Amino acid sequence: MDSLADQIRRRRTFAIISHPDAGKTTLTEKLLLYGGAIRLAGAVKGRKAARAATSDWMEIEKQRGISVTTSVMQFEYGGCMVNILDTPGHQDFSEDTYRTLEAADSAVMLIDAAKGVEPQTIKLFQVCRMRGIPIFTFVNKLDREGKDPFALMQEIEDVLGMRTCPMNWPVGMGSTFKGVYDRQKGHVELFDNRDHGQTKARVETTGVDDPALSAVLGEDLHRRLVEEIELLDVAGDPWDFDRFRRGDLSPLFWGSALTNFGVQSFLEYFLKLAPAPAPRLAGDRLVDPEEPRFSAFVFKIQANMNPAHRDRIAFMRIVSGRFERGMDVQHVRLGKKVRLSQPQQFMAQDRQIVEEAYAGDIIGVFDPGIFRIGDTLCTGEPVAFEGIPSFSPEHFARVRFKDAMKSKHFRKGLEELTEEGAIQVFYATQPGHPDPILGAVGELQFEVFQHRMRHEYGVEVILDRLPYEVARWVEGEGYQPRRFWGTDHMAVTDRDGRNVLLFRNEWTMRYVVEQNPGLIFRATAQAR
């Protein structure tokens, strides 16, 4: 049996980040295909027989064809245990993605070859930078016409301030995309796939100097490939593992997730280069993954993964030690012991009971209403990992329900969806305004909230938009909410009773901040 250290060192836990429609869910499906977790990929849009993507499991996701929650998937490949966190690409759900990146040891940045570095990619890249996690880059959709590969490399450096080292190089693009040249192995991988990417691509390998290659590629494409390889060898950044681990250099891969071209070689290089679980700060000390004592933190709560049972699952990232089914752990925030008797691991909504898990793994446990995002669980010496912040919403609305008989269902739905981080809720301090106020990073969150209240809790809700765009958490002894009862701002409290001010715009917010030097205004709130 493998030792604790051996089990932990073979874990690879990563998140995929991208702008919407860069192909993130498709890439996730194809990694699962190559990992043997699924036999037939189903994320091929536009095909009548296409199955719903494995990672897009919520009803609204299937209807809209977008990911709005984080899916957690695990498979074993090449001696490694791989945990994929497939995050929402839509900008309205970036807060869920921020939380998920707290649970990842590395990230795969997916870029559309035709569109280059897009706004949401920039935001998520910056979060990875702040966390100091290594970043892999996968340029996708080479089966379509896109930007020149050298121009894309320059764009990544100019926009993100990060150099790249191509581990492979595309052979053609669009209709002439034939495969990739593996710079480490020195051979060309030619792809053949006749079933729309539903099964693994067939691969033939040959040397770049093979005379037969000209017959396959055509003389012009073959000559251009040789010239580009020579240019890369002279002018490109050499591979440097230390620079990669510091986040200064990103290994760059080219391919097409839709057709599976380049996916397997990317997966194999990823497992070779990606870091095993890293230590995490708890107060004034680092908790090492190989410490024998179990510790974990909750980064996501998902209600109604099985609507028939109205269940709620708390997802936790194991930071150290070994987890065993049925073990008693300390719930640090509540200061009490809890038993984790039904731990589960997931393939999107499909689940199985897990008997044991190790640092780096993601497990889900039944939540009877005692967990919050950011909670720490541990055995032995109590530790408390840093909380996961809430971000300032940019859209606000009062929420009320149509049917007075649904009051209990409304309160339950609002509480559960707030606790899982799907929406933020505030309460006006001014008398006469009893209805809760919802805060969202983007408009689509309101739509998802209404959809889930209707379908999961049986409540029709009405949203009345409010004219505010900025929220700031306020601290300071001199703060008096009634001073801010006006038309340009609103004094509210969040669900933990903390003081918050809502502002019409950035200008109003800056003016109030300048006029109140004795108060502290924060754009984020640390989880309690």
Curated annotation (Swiss-Prot):
Xref: InterPro entries: EF-G-like_DII (IPR053905), EFG_III/V (IPR035647), G_TR_CS (IPR031157), P-loop_NTPase (IPR027417), PrfC (IPR004548), RF3_C (IPR032090), RF3_dom_3_sf (IPR038467), RF3_GTP-bd (IPR041732)
Cysteine disulfide partners in this protein: none
The keyword Ligase appears for this protein: no
Entry's transmembrane regions: none
Alphabetical UniProt keywords: Cytoplasm, GTP-binding, Nucleotide-binding, Protein biosynthesis
Cellular component, GO annotation: cytosol
Pfam families per the UniProt record, alphabetical: EF-G_D2 (PF22042), GTP_EFTU (PF00009), RF3_C (PF16658)
Family: Belongs to the TRAFAC class translation factor GTPase superfamily. Classic translation factor GTPase family. PrfC subfamily.
Name the record gives this protein: Peptide chain release factor 3
